């Protein structure tokens, strides 16, 4: 019980600090300490504790919708409005992703831009590994910037490959894409979608795509919303990880913390509304079971 733990630690640490660490309000703690919550039924008390535990476990990354899904998975019969109400009572506020601000990698006008193969494609994908989307984003470090390259399966939202480095040369995206290939062979004709940055136009990357018979697709010129899927992903990663690490101390820390977040949390635990409120890994497992049964 979070409040009981705060009470146990209070002789050694200030209440204000403990409440901040555990993500609860001082007023809610003092209500508990003064016995004002004694009239609450056991069932409601259990629900409050479950909400608080989920919120703390996911490090303020879950709002009412995902907490509701987690509660239902645990056997609670609860609606989103009820969760919202409990979160307000407990003064729990989830991290909010930043607004999408379009950015782009540097384009190379000397190299031809591939067409956008997703424009008239409906639905965008019907199964795994049909469309892989990628991009590069920036992350502040102690001395300079770090560059994160990510490739994501558009159907399952699983991050299949990523690399962070102190440069944004073509090697950055090819190393990340090599991890995609490590997950298994991509069928010929799989669409690989990105912006028109010079890294994606490089001979090295295009030769890699030709070798595996993959189709390259790029956003239209000055239309960054063509790759909104990956931009939304970056917005979420930065909001949820920068809250703890606004600036990495060095490349080693960046690699460790991104591995913990992407491979240890985002792919395996974090519920996604676009895939039925489950994690990408669980979604892929369910998809494989379904295709085997058919």
Language-model segment annotations:
Residues 1-294:
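Charged DNA-binding/catalytic regions of mobile-element recombinases
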């Amino acid at each position: 019980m979070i409040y009981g733990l705060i009470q146990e630690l209070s002789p050694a640490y200030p209440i204000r600090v403990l409440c901040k660490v555990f993500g609860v309000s001082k007023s809610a703690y003092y209500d508990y300490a003064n016995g004002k919550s004694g009239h609450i039924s056991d069932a409601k008390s259990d629900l409050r504790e479950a909400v608080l535990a989920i919120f703390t476990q996911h490090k303020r990354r879950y709002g009412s919708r995902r907490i509701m899904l987690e509660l239902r998975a645990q056997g609670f019969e609860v609606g989103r409005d009820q969760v919202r109400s409990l979160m307000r009572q407990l003064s729990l506020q989830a991290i909010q992703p930043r607004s999408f601000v379009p950015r782009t990698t540097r384009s190379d006008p000397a190299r031809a831009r591939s067409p956008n193969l997703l424009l008239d494609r409906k639905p965008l994908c019907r199964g795994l590994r049909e469309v892989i989307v990628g991009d590069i984003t920036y992350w502040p470090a102690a001395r300079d910037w770090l560059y994160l390259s990510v490739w994501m399966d558009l159907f399952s939202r699983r991050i299949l490959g990523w690399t962070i480095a102190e440069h944004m040369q073509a090697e950055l995206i090819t190393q990340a894409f090599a991890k995609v290939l490590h997950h298994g062979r991509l069928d010929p004709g799989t669409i690989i979608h990105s912006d028109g940055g010079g890294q994606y136009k490089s001979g090295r990357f295009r030769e890699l795509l030709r070798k595996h018979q993959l189709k390259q697709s790029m956003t239209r010129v000055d239309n960054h919303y063509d790759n909104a899927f990956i931009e939304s992903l970056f917005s979420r990663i930065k909001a949820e990880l920068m809250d703890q690490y606004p600036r990495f101390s060095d490349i080693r820390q960046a690699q460790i913390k991104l591995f913990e977040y992407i491979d240890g949390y985002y792919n395996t635990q974090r519920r996604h509304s676009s895939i039925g409120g489950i994690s990408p890994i669980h979604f892929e497992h369910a998809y494989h079971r379904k295709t085997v049964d058919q």
